[in-house]
Amino acid sequence: MALITDTNRAPAIAPQPKGIIDPNTGRPIGADDPTFLSISDELADRGFLLTTTDELINWARTGSLMWMTFGLACCAVEMMQMSMPRYDCERFGFAPRGSPRQSDVMIVAGTLTNKMAPALRKVYDQMPEPRYVISMGSCANGGGYYHYSYSVVRGCDRVVPVDIYVPGCPPTAEALLYGVLLLQKKIRRTGTIER
């Protein structure tokens, strides 16, 4: 019995991955990341990788960030959309958790009032170290539309330290996902002992 093959057909070639395009460079995010370039060069030269414990922990941490929502207003809808199948933030290692004790990242989305500020700080204090905060939307960043109201905190950075600011009213799910990727890049850049 002979194997029948078509020798006239060209071999199948997988398409190039596109990824999310960086609006500043027009290239996929991470395409010019020195971390990935050095890894591919080292693998090509030696066939194995050498690293420090710090770099290994940072690599593992960026691929397994657990986030907790602190949705206060309309921005929370866009935050939910980021978890849906169209954007699927879990493919970047960014999975939701229901408890602050299991979370690495808190996303503050919406208007933070003076009455809610102590609760935000309490939830932040319950998160294990290292902990990160993403401020999402104009209201969380600086008070937004309600900036001059007597009952609104003019930015959640007055209550908790913020690592990434995502602008917009409300910001799109793509903008939040870009903020998550920037947070992962920031974690790779910084040490594990000191933030």
Curated annotation (Swiss-Prot):
Its EC number is 7.1.1.-. Keywords: 4Fe-4S, Cell inner membrane, Cell membrane, Iron, Iron-sulfur, Membrane, Metal-binding, NAD, Quinone, Translocase, Transport, Ubiquinone. Disulfide bonds: none annotated. InterPro entries: NADH_UbQ_OxRdtase-like_20kDa, NADH_UQ_OxRdtase_20Kd_su. GO terms for cellular component: plasma membrane; respiratory chain complex I. GO terms for molecular function: 4 iron, 4 sulfur cluster binding; iron ion binding; NADH dehydrogenase (ubiquinone) activity; NADH:ubiquinone reductase (non-electrogenic) activity; quinone binding. It holds the Pfam family Oxidored_q6. The keyword 4Fe-4S applies. It is a peripheral membrane protein. It is an enzyme of class 7 (translocase). Transmembrane segments: none annotated. [4Fe-4S] cluster binds at residues 74-75, 139, 169. It catalyses: a quinone + NADH + 5 H(+)(in) = a quinol + NAD(+) + 4 H(+)(out). It is found in: Cell inner membrane. Its main location: membrane. Binds 1 [4Fe-4S] cluster. Its cofactor is [4Fe-4S] cluster. Gene3D superfamilies: 3.40.50.12280. One of its GO terms (biological process) is electron transport coupled proton transport. NDH-1 shuttles electrons from NADH, via FMN and iron-sulfur (Fe-S) centers, to quinones in the respiratory chain. The immediate electron acceptor for the enzyme in this species is believed to be ubiquinone. Couples the redox reaction to proton translocation (for every two electrons transferred, four hydrogen ions are translocated across the cytoplasmic membrane), and thus conserves the redox energy in a proton gradient. Belongs to the complex I 20 kDa subunit family. NDH-1 is composed of 14 different subunits. Subunits NuoB, C, D, E, F, and G constitute the peripheral sector of the complex. This is NADH-quinone oxidoreductase subunit B. It comes from Methylobacterium radiotolerans (strain ATCC 27329 / DSM 1819 / JCM 2831 / NBRC 15690 / NCIMB 10815 / 0-1). The gene is nuoB.
